[in-house]
Amino acid sequence: MANRTVKDAHSIHGTNPQYLVEKIIRTRIYESKYWKEECFGLTAELVVDKAMELRFVGGVYGGNIKPTPFLCLTLKMLQIQPEKDIIVEFIKNEDFKYVRMLGALYMRLTGTAIDCYKYLEPLYNDYRKIKSQNRNGEFELMHVDEFIDELLHSERVCDIILPRLQKRYVLEEAEQLEPRVSALEEDMDDVESSEEEEEEDEKLERVPSPDHRRRSYRDLDKPRRSPTLRYRRSRSRSPRRRSRSPKRRSPSPRRERHRSKSPRRHRSRSRDRRHRSRSKSPGHHRSHRHRSHSKSPERSKKSHKKSRRGNE
């Protein structure tokens, strides 16, 4: 029959694996449409295809207690009892989150306390969102790590009573389980180590090397340079100045006025030079004396006439 457990199935927690689900809920599952149409004749390989089609998790819902496909596949896995390696691959699957949730619930129902902590605690680092259907048939939003936390600490998940789980600290004291290290602690350790490395690098940069000390030594006998030459202020060019930098500045008209010599001044200077050159030459003195003392005949006639008129 379709509702019987396989012959070579092992008892779990001293009982038939299907009996881990309550009889009322188990009966509702056997009578559901999904169980009769989709779960008939399924094997461990075919369960994977059905698990990939899941879109939400949940137990039973509605007034007449209808089971969800997630709950039906859970009971089917208890019935066929797949190998542990297949369940571990379900849990490690990162592409399909509902396949992972199905494997986690089955591991919690059938696995030992050590296996539950070993395979389920790493899923605390999965923060993906999943849909959950409540008793009223409404969908709620939750995360993968919340679902894992309920599996490890709650008594009932998806309307299934979970087996008792041994406390973690008891297993740690018995040295059967190592203390759990969360991903947050690992990140904090990485941050602290990186900060320590940065501080060490800064200290090494602050400590001057012997070469630097030799360079910084100053001879007291040598005269000290003026601070203006040493600490020369660099002019910061504005964008406007940068644009004008390739072109050379034209001299201001005021400077040009001082530099340029006026023609009048130039003439006077040239005359002085000529006069000096003539005064130095001996011929110039003679000609000058001759011009100053000797009179022309016309000029002498005019002076003679003027003297005559004065006498008359």
Curated annotation (Swiss-Prot):
Task: From the UniProt entry, list the residue stretches annotated as the region Disordered.
Answer: 181-312
Here the segments flagged for biased composition (Basic and acidic residues) are: 203-224
GO term, biological process aspect, one: mRNA splicing, via spliceosome
Indicate where this protein resides in the cell. Nucleus
* Region (N-terminal protein interaction domain), start-end ranges: 1-179
Tell me a GO cellular component. nucleoplasm
Instruction: Tell me the domain of life.
Output: Eukaryota
> Which is one GO molecular function term here?
RNA binding
Name the UniProt key words of this record, in alphabetical order.
Coiled coil, mRNA processing, mRNA splicing, Nucleus, Phosphoprotein, Spliceosome
- List, as start-end ranges, the regions of compositional bias called Acidic residues: 184-202
| Bias kind Basic residues: ranges | 225-294, 301-312
Which spans of this chain does the record mark as coiled coil? 170-204
Modified positions (Phosphoserine) are 11, 193-194, 209, 226
Family statement drawn from the similarity comment of this UniProt entry: Belongs to the PRP38 family.
Q: How does it assemble?
A: Component of the spliceosome B complex. Interacts (via N-terminal interaction domain) with ZMAT2 and MFAP1.
What the protein does comes down to: Involved in pre-mRNA splicing as a component of the spliceosome.
What this protein is called in its record is Pre-mRNA-splicing factor 38A
What gene name is given for the protein in this entry?
PRPF38A
